[in-house]
From Swiss-Prot:
Protein name (database record): DNA ligase
Pfam family, one: DNA_ligase_ZBD
One MF annotation (Gene Ontology) recorded for this entry: DNA binding
Organism: Synechococcus sp. (strain JA-2-3B'a(2-13)) (Cyanobacteria bacterium Yellowstone B-Prime)
UniProt gene name: ligA
Xref: CDD domains: BRCT_DNA_ligase_like (cd17748), LIGANc (cd00114)
Amino acid sequence: MDPKLEERARELRTLLQKASIAYYVHDAPILEDSVYDRLYRELQELERAYPELVTPDSPTQRVGEKPAEHFPTVFHRIPLYSLENAFNPEELEEWQERLLRVLGRAPVPDSRTEGELEYVCELKIDGAALALTYIEGLLERGATRGDGQAGEDITPNVRAIRSIPLRLATADPPPVLEVRGEVYLALAEFERINQERRSAGDPPFANPRNCAAGTLRQLDSRVVAARKLSFFAYALHWPEGWPAGDPPQTQWQCLQQLKELGFPVNPLSQVCRGLGEVIQFYERWRGAQLPYASDGVVVKLNSLRLQEEAGFTQKFPRWAIALKYPAQEVPTRIRAIVASVGRTGAVTPVAELEPVPLAGTLVSRASLHNADRLRELDVHIGDTAIVRKAGEIIPEVVGILKELRPADAVPYSLPSQCPECHTPLVRPPGEAVTRCPNPECPAKLRGQLQHWASRDALDIEGLGEKRAAQLVESLGVRTVADLYRLTPEQLQGLEGMGSRSSQKLVQAIQRSRQQPWERVLYGLGIPHVGVVTAQILAGHFPTPELLAQASAETIAQIYGIGAEVAEAVVAWFAEPAHRRLLQELQALGIPALPQQENPAVSQILAGKKFVITGTLPTLSRQQAKAWIESRGGKVTASVSRQTDYVVVGSDPGSKLEQAQQLGIPLLTEAELLALDPTVESGDLHP
């Protein structure tokens, strides 16, 4: 190989990469399009003639020649959380009050003008979330958000997005770097694509978000390249010890770091001091003409240390919220009203509508919430209703145009009997919801089976809405325990179930016997007990018996569990039917428990804050974190004056030096375990 050809290929790659960063990141092109295209073709011809010159980060390698057959599922090392929504400044202020309580700070006298907290405001782009992983500076993987825990590996399509760098713009890349951001479609490009689809006789896309999300899942990356998706980065996760010197301490510094690495960052982002400046930012951009679709403002606590202290709920980071623009409202006619029964027996009136486009989707159903709301609105079948869709919530009826009410409009009120099982409905004292009290109501049974089989519970593949209905209606399944008595022969009698599919479903059901207690607890569907709450409760009460015997006062004292949850748990276990169900499940070996049951773990570390640095002798970092948190402690990512202990292993990072400077006590792994005198030698279980 001629060294001059190698050098020329390297020069072309470097120049084209710099040109892409200048164009997409800094909005300051250094090459005319025609010049870029000519240089690109020169590199392409060189690589075609000499394939050994091709490198993974070459601009020519963005688009593959062969369509993918499928997208494999990948698990996110760091979950992608959703954002809590606020729909007006008042809800934003309520969020800040909750945040201040979590951080242990005094309320702000005038939260709009004298806020002591500093925030970063970023426009909320209406697109699709993307998780990028770089290994030694090269793009290794791009994945969709999915359910936040697992998504689809769409790396070939990610490589086709010109604004996403294939190589980080740094001479000192970390071993692993994760970047999060939003893929979106510029409005002009969206219009061009839809015009092409109309000309071809294809239906147009409803909105840019749907088009962007659908494009990401195209099996042919050439289609992705042709649609010219764009990307804004907004978060990164880096390993300890990188970058050299001072790592980012704030969200704003993270955004600047992303730009330095070659990622496009929305230039309209801004640091705001207090909610007053946040609301000014929101008002400035609400209704503004932008080159992309935006449905609100994302407000993030600027300090990464305070973000760490605030932590997460089951679904959201406590330190961030989306302040959404006012919801879109449209009028349409109510064709009928039906009463829908959920798994807890809650009866919700639902309006069936003349289909109407709303917020990019075709809406044909909308919630009327409850009996009080029905009376307040004075809803009639045949009325013209005002329907609103705010964010990702289901559409709701917010008003009735009574002046348009036809003469034959029919008043509606909730039935007195359950529409599914005809049991008289009840309204518990103090509740707005009307419920069906029948434990054998088919609608409740269907919902309970679906919840039990859901991914975060027992994770039974193949047991969805349709199959749950068949099991209840055709096979007489009445409790989740009945699932474990089903045979392939019984299932083969159901519509759509053959020999193979019946065998697979029975195997999936039987495999779920091995799921741990925390998943079973979540699957029981106890009110207010979500995934995270179930994990906390299972950590403190390692068997169903221990939890069933606990008082509301005992449960409420656990860090992260409040009185409302505690009372709901005690009330659930007090029901004879629920106790019988647990006995049935335990007779079936559910949940799978260790041979020797652990006693309830003490809370000896309650209120203490720990930082872990280096590699511990026997515990992984995750195991050490779980051990500390199960005893009431909290593990944070950075050392501060509020840190009580730093646990030090081999090859510690800069946190050790920081702890020594601040005079914070240092612990070995053995000294950490010795903090709990109830732990016997060799017992390292959380």
